[in-house]
């Protein structure tokens, strides 16, 4: 077992996050490590885990990082970022009430997760909840996903960000590479540092890492 990034460990084809919490979030394997735990990070349940296993180089997240997570769903990836950014805050925005109920339950067991039941299109409604944002992570399957990202980035001005580009949500007719190129060209005020095709874990989705 080797630590490959801050609080992220790898053992052959599996990766884990170092956690102070031994409660399972989605049925993942947990290994005891002295006074802490290692939670297995499933690449088929988390696009960030898939990207790391595909060689993503910018996953050394600071433990004090404050993250605005757009499209948090039930909190699978949020929970692992909570392990990593143990001294930071995760502002997790989710619109679906059913998903939010599980996300809220997760936040009750982790004091660095702040769930927000809101539409990420309507940043004016939740911007006052977010005290500080160093990083945006967005995973939203909507046609206007880049517009959502640009609106939030203009308000919060994080130094760096991850955008999951969901090709089929934008168009199911145009060639994938054409959509990817056009989508990336629509991102404002950021320099693209890394693009990861998430195959075979996730078909038709790309992780884009960028910095100001």
Curated annotation (Swiss-Prot):
Q: What does this protein do?
A: Involved in pre-rRNA and tRNA processing. Utilizes the methyl donor S-adenosyl-L-methionine to catalyze the site-specific 2'-hydroxyl methylation of ribose moieties in rRNA and tRNA. Site specificity is provided by a guide RNA that base pairs with the substrate. Methylation occurs at a characteristic distance from the sequence involved in base pairing with the guide RNA.
Q: Which GO terms describe its molecular function?
A: histone H2AQ104 methyltransferase activity; RNA binding; rRNA methyltransferase activity
TM regions (residue ranges): none
What is this protein identified as?
Answer: Fibrillarin-like rRNA/tRNA 2'-O-methyltransferase
A GO BP annotation: box C/D sno(s)RNA 3'-end processing
Q: What EC number(s) does the entry state?
A: 2.1.1.-
Q: Which InterPro entries match?
A: Fibrillarin, SAM-dependent_MTases_sf
State the UniProt keywords alphabetically: Methyltransferase, RNA-binding, rRNA processing, Transferase, tRNA processing
Q: Which family does it belong to?
A: Belongs to the methyltransferase superfamily. Fibrillarin family.
UniProt entry tagged with the keyword tRNA processing: yes
One Pfam family matching this protein: Fibrillarin
Question: What are the leading ranks of the lineage?
Answer: Archaea, Methanobacteriati, Thermoplasmatota, Thermoplasmata, Thermoplasmatales
**In which domain of life is the source organism classified?**
Archaea
Q: Where does S-adenosyl-L-methionine bind?
A: 76-77, 94-95, 119-120, 139-142
Q: Can you list the disulfide-bonded cysteine pairs? A: none
Q: How does it assemble?
A: Interacts with nop5. Component of box C/D small ribonucleoprotein (sRNP) particles that contain rpl7ae, FlpA and nop5, plus a guide RNA.
Q: Does the keyword Signal apply?
A: no
């Amino acid at each position: 077992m080797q630590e490959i990034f801050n609080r992220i460990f790898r053992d052959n084809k599996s990766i884990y996050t170092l956690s102070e919490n031994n409660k399972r979030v989605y049925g993942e394997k947990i290994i005891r490590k002295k006074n802490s735990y290692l939670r297995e990070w499933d690449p088929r349940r988390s696009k960030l885990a898939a990207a790391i296993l595909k060689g993503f180089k910018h996953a050394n997240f600071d433990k004090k990082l404050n993250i605005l997570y757009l499209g948090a769903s039930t909190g699978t990836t949020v929970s692992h970022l909570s392990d990593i950014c143990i001294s930071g805050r995760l502002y997790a925005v989710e619109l679906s009430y059913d998903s939010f109920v599980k996300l809220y339950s997760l936040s009750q067991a982790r004091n660095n997760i702040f769930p927000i039941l809101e539409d990420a299109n309507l940043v004016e409604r939740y911007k006052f909840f977010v005290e500080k944002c160093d990083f945006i992570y967005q995973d939203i399957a909507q046609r206007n996903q880049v517009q959502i990202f640009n609106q939030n980035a203009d308000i919060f001005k994080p130094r760096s960000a991850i955008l999951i580009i969901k090709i089929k949500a934008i168009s199911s007719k145009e060639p994938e590479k054409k959509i990817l190129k056009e989508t990336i060209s629509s991102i404002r005020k950021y320099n693209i540092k890394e693009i990861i095709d998430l195959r075979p874990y996730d078909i038709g989705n790309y992780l884009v890492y960028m910095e100001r």
